[in-house]
């Protein structure tokens, strides 16, 4: 310790005592050491304590594997370089603050994943993901967002990085409600949802959950992003399929106030609107598989 010294003590029992100056230096040194330990141990842990779950395990490997599988199944996408796709995906969030992600960060990935979906073949959905995906598994020429390359890559995954490092954060990621909305996952889905809606043309279908209190929720991705990015010069009609929760529910949910709100929004954008009750979703899927079945002529 610089400028600190030991002082002899007079008396019958000689010993070594620290001078007041030395004691002060020692105390300051101990405090500095404690502070260093706190900064090294506590601060990194504090940075990781977001409210949401951490990045999905084996995230890089999962994205790459999904890309390879998708491009093998879809011949029109075989030109895609999956390593470049992963590099662009990673570049959108690595080393960036996980609450300060922008749509621009994802633009390189968007360009690599550009994909043309035929007119009349887009199916949007809100709060009824499983049935929408069951439908497109049967009706193979219809596409939800998750049936496109970019949607397929990220479906059900979580990811974020650590600010100013090249690390992926596997401990926790921001929750869009509790922490911030400009997080890597939320911004990704907002970006791809907007592009998906902008590309839609002719008749666009949307599947809505009739068992929810708000059948159309203007705060959902469909209500806040996709509805407002349908292009009137390309889209003729938005047709809503309202899925009923049980056979005993015979109400006309197309008259629900939230559906009327949706109709008003769409009409003001110079797009036609139609609505259909799907009273029996199980029968609905059966009739998609076998449209010639005589029972499919009745209302489902």
From Swiss-Prot:
The chain crosses the membrane at residues 22-42. Keywords: Diabetes mellitus, Disulfide bond, Glycoprotein, Hydrolase, Membrane, NAD, NADP, Receptor, Signal-anchor, Transferase, Transmembrane, Transmembrane helix. InterPro entries: ADP-ribosyl_cyclase. Changing residue 201 to E: Loss of cADPR hydrolase activity. ATP inhibits the cADPR hydrolyzing activity. Disulfide bonds join 67-82, 99-180, 160-173, 254-275, 287-296. GO terms for biological process: apoptotic signaling pathway; artery smooth muscle contraction; B cell proliferation; B cell receptor signaling pathway; female pregnancy; long-term synaptic depression; NAD metabolic process; negative regulation of apoptotic process. This is ADP-ribosyl cyclase/cyclic ADP-ribose hydrolase 1. It comes from Homo sapiens (Human).
């Amino acid at each position: 310790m610089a400028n600190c010294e030991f002082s002899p003590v007079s008396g019958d029992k000689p010993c070594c005592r620290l001078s007041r100056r030395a004691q002060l230096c020692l105390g300051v040194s101990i405090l500095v050491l404690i502070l260093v330990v706190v900064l090294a141990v506590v601060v990194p842990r504090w940075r990781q304590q977001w409210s949401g779950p951490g990045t999905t395990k084996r995230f890089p490997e999962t994205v790459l594997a999904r890309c390879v599988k998708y491009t093998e199944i879809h011949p029109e996408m075989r030109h895609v370089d999956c390593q470049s796709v992963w590099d662009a995906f990673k570049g959108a969030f690595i080393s960036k603050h996980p609450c300060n992600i922008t749509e621009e960060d994802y633009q390189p990935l968007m360009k690599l994943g550009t994909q043309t979906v035929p007119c009349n073949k887009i199916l949007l959905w809100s709060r009824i993901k499983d049935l929408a995906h069951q439908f497109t598994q049967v009706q193979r020429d219809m596409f939800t967002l998750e049936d496109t390359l970019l949607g397929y890559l990220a479906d059900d995954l979580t990811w974020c990085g650590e600010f100013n490092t090249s690390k992926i954060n596997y401990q926790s990621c921001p929750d869009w409600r509790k922490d911030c909305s400009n997080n890597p996952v939320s911004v990704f889905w907002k970006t791809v949802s907007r592009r998906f809606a902008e590309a839609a043309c002719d008749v666009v279908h949307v599947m809505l959950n009739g068992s929810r209190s708000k059948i159309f929720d203007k705060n959902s991705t469909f209500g806040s992003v996709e509805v407002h990015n349908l292009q009137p010069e390309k889209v003729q009609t938005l047709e809503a399929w309202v899925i009923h929760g049980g056979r005993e529910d015979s109400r006309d949910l197309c008259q629900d106030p939230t559906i009327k709100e949706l109709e008003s929004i769409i009409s003001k954008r110079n797009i036609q609107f139609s609505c259909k009750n799907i009273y029996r979703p199980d029968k609905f899927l059966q009739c998609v598989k076998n449209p010639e079945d005589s029972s499919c002529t009745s209302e489902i």
